[in-house]
UniProtKB/Swiss-Prot annotation:
Gene3D superfamilies xrefs: alpha/beta hydrolase
Residues at the catalytic site: 230 (acyl-ester intermediate), 351 (charge relay system), 416 (charge relay system)
The name this protein goes by in its record: Chlorogenic acid esterase
Carbohydrate attachment residues: 47, 80, 98, 271, 295, 322, 328, 391, 402, 474
Similarity comment: Belongs to the type-B carboxylesterase/lipase family.
Lineage: Eukaryota, Fungi, Dikarya, Ascomycota, Pezizomycotina
Cystine residue pairs: 92-120, 281-292
Length: 512
């Protein structure tokens, strides 16, 4: 399982692309743009790309994790004047790679933009106009998104994952996206530290901040869904085990990931000590080593980590601490040590295409299938099985879309992350126009995700929209059935010309 994360970490790397988020309107007269929070007053804006969406980009939820706070648990942000939240924040320090993948050659819209920095613990918020919220007579549900990146890279500044157009269209939900520390800065696992997984603690602090403050933005703190993809999905599901009695959120969504994709066996803390030796902090006690590493420049650490090519490789991902990350997820599930809240989870039919070095012809179908199953699909299936053992409500899907503006070469198919432009509603923006079928799939998936957070107890439902029925049998109402082992309750999107259809999960599970 360590190989799974090594592959994800190597291929989902950071490269810079341009994102423009310049504010067109900074208004404080009744528009609900200046919001009081525990971090101080936050000034937002409108712009022309989504004129009915209030945006706050780069809202601090923790103090900058620099100096003595490097490698330490996050510290709540203290107010220090008005924050002008007008631009997406820098991502946390990235571990980079020169690998050639479909993301670096064709689909750069998934890559982060705007550079990276240690001062990175920010989140961004997209909400409808205040008068549109007030007309709905209750606060809005909230999707709180954790980006992926193999726990070594990633952040909120990614073209395909900017939700302003989605919020503009629905005017019925709020989206929040967070940054968190990654690689050695987020998962140092140093002998001198009591907390090896401070990146996961960053995520928890972001959840706490949103729960405490989202009402002031028009959101409902009782209707927050924690949503993530890839490493973000692993974080979401791990979160449910780490906070079984106090999850804060009401629902979970995990796209293409589960906690068992991570197997960090560095119990002796050797990775941190080895990295320390590369930057001049060798031969020290654990306390001295930690102090020395806190005084090395962030760029020097980044360069040492990103350029080391020896064997065995070194990586920094969540380590077992039996507080935020556990050695036996099945045992946690069957003993009830998991949050009793519902989950949507699933995988894509051709995840493997995102984890191979790019060639125009691509690997064989059998190779891609084996990678898909081993790295993502089977770990997700195992997590679903664990939740079934714990009698937890789980809705399971598979995404099969192969749209040319997202997958320009036929062998790409529904690769790792390909569902995200469909869900965020950005599928038409960067690779050419979308077909009506693609729009129909997007609307269906968005409707189900949103209905889930609107009422997690009821579960995801969908009404017919225009000429598009709610499901393939032309009914006007579709209720997604909770998944049970051996049932035909796997909801497949975008396959065989159908928007969605229920099938058996043997197409995945029989090969695990």
């Amino acid at each position: 399982m360590l190989l799974r994360l090594c592959i994800i970490a190597t291929l989902l790397v950071s490269h810079c692309v341009a994102v423009s988020t310049s504010p067109a309107t900074r208004d404080t007269n009744g528009e609900g743009l200046l919001v009081q929070t525990s971090s101080g007053p936050i000034q937002g804006f409108f712009n022309q790309t989504a004129p009915d969406v209030r945006q706050w980009l780069g809202v601090p939820f923790a103090e900058p994790p620099v100096g003595d706070l490097r490698f330490s648990s996050p510290v709540k942000k203290q107010p220090n004047g008005t924050v002008n939240a007008f631009a997406l924040p820098s991502s946390c320090i990235q571990q980079t790679s020169n690998s050639s993948t479909i993301y670096t050659t064709y689909e750069t819209g998934f890559l982060i933009s705007g550079g990276d920095s240690e001062d990175c613990l920010y989140l961004s918020i997209w909400a409808p106009r205040i008068e549109n919220i007030q007309s709905q007579q209750r606060p809005l549900p909230v999707l709180l998104y954790i980006p992926g990146g193999g726990f070594t890279s990633g952040g909120e500044a990614s073209l395909y994952k900017i939700p302003d157009k989605w919020v503009q269209r629905t005017q019925s939900h709020i989206v929040v996206i967070m940054n968190y520390r990654v690689n050695v800065f987020g998962f140092p696992n140093a002998e001198g530290l009591s907390e090896p997984n401070v990146g996961l603690l960053d995520q928890r602090m972001a959840v706490e901040w949103v729960a405490a403050n989202i009402a002031n933005f028009g959101g409902d703190p009782a209707r927050i869904a924690l949503w993530g993809q890839s490493a973000g999905a692993a974080s979401v599901t791990a979160y449910s085990y780490g906070y079984p009695e106090d999850p804060i959120v009401a629902a979970l969504i995990a796209d293409s990931g589960a906690p068992n994709i991570v197997d960090n066996e560095d119990y002796a803390h050797t990775n941190f000590t080895f990295l320390a030796s590369l930057v001049g902090c060798d031969g020290l006690s654990s306390t001295e080593e930690l102090s020395c590493m806190r005084n090395v420049s962030a760029r020097k650490l980044q360069t040492a980590l990103s350029t080391y090519s020896g064997s065995p490789s070194i990586s920094f991902t969540p380590a077992v601490d039996n507080k935020t990350f556990f050695a036996n997820w099945t045992e946690r599930a069957i003993t009830g040590k998991v949050a009793k809240i519902p989950l949507i989870t699933g995988s894509n039919t051709n995840e493997g295409a995102g984890f191979v070095s790019f060639t125009p012809a691509g690997p064989s179908k059998s190779t891609l299938f084996e990678i898909t199953e081993s790295i993502i699909a089977c770990p997700v299936a195992e997590e679903v099985k664990n939740r079934n053992l714990a009698n937890l409500t789980t809705y399971r899907y598979q995404y099969a879309g192969n749209f040319t503006n997202i997958s320009p070469l036929p062998w790409f198919g529904a690769y790792h992350s390909a569902e995200l432009p469909i869900l965020f509603g950005t599928h038409y923006e960067y690779g050419g126009p979308s077909t009506q079928y693609e729009w129909d799939v997007s609307y269906a998936m968005q409707a189900l995700w949103l209905s889930f957070v609107e009422d997690p107890t009821r579960g995801p439902v969908r009404l017919a929209v225009g000429n598009v029925p709610a499901n393939p049998t032309n009914e006007s109402y579709f209720a997604w059935p909770a998944f049970e082992q051996g049932s035909d309750d796997l909801l497949v999107f975008a396959e065989g010309g159908k928007v969605m259809q229920l099938v058996g999960a043997g197409r995945i599970d029989d090969y695990c």
